[in-house]
Amino acid sequence: MAGSLAALAALATLTGTPALAQDKSMDEIAKYREMLADGNPAELIEMRGEELWKTPRGPKNVSLEQCDLGLGPGKVEGAYAQLPRYFADAGKVMDVEARLVYCMQTQQGFSFAEATKNWYSKPGKESDLVALVTWVGAQSNGQKINVPVKHPKEAEMVKMGEYIFHRRSGPQDFGCSVCHGQDGVRIRLQDLDNLSQSKGAQKAMRTWPAYRVSQGTVWTMQRRLIDCMRQARWPEQKFPSDAVIALEMYLQNKAAGGVLESPGIKR
């Protein structure tokens, strides 16, 4: 807590003209993130996710310990690093959230509406699904992103995601690539990674899910992308969104080889 307050104080004291203060601002923001990462609040949500994974729940009163996240029933370590991927039992490509919802339905007996009712966290109201994603993601910490593209439907989703990334749409004629398709782009004090290149994609994708300080809770990658689409004034995506999963697939494929540091921490 003391470190967080010190970091906020440092951030608040930035002065000078925008041009002269720019580099100093980014240095202070980097220090701020370092201080916060030392006691990432996401760790508490991660612990809750593990408990939810192991606790019998739902109409069938069973746990999720036999849920297959792509590496076999109950195998969690390294699974997040290889998602999204194609699942034969569902006949489609799924990311971690879509797969957990599937397991909650098929194994625990929850309805789709019940499993997705609170799919994202709000300040003071944590989502069970987000907690599960946070824990699953943490089990791939230190592993390289390695999304499979062997199945035709996986390759199809990568192409679809690439199309969505570069498509300009909506009343503002806006798209992902406007902000994230070139080097040196910034919004206010926020440097924007070039996600069309491997280096930028690795840097961005390796720290999700992440605790967002400005929101006071953990955001998943699907939540982040859905919100990006909202900000671009695109049609609202219904969770879990195949379009968003395709975009995730494209970005994770671009980020191949990046080492996960999950859960991360963001502004």
Model segments located where?
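An amphipathic alpha-helix/helix-turn recognition signal
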Residues: 44-45, 156
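Electron-transfer interface patches adjacent to heme c in soluble/periplasmic c-type cytochromes
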Residues: 21-44, 54-69, 73-131, 141-142, ...
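Sec/Tat signal peptide C-region and signal peptidase I cleavage site
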Residues: 15-21
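Solvent-exposed, charged amphipathic helical/linker segments at domain boundaries
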Residues: 143-160
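Hydrophobic, well-structured mid-protein blocks that either form specific transmembrane helices
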Residues: 132-139, 148-149
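Short secondary-structure capping micro-motifs at structural edges
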Residues: 162-166
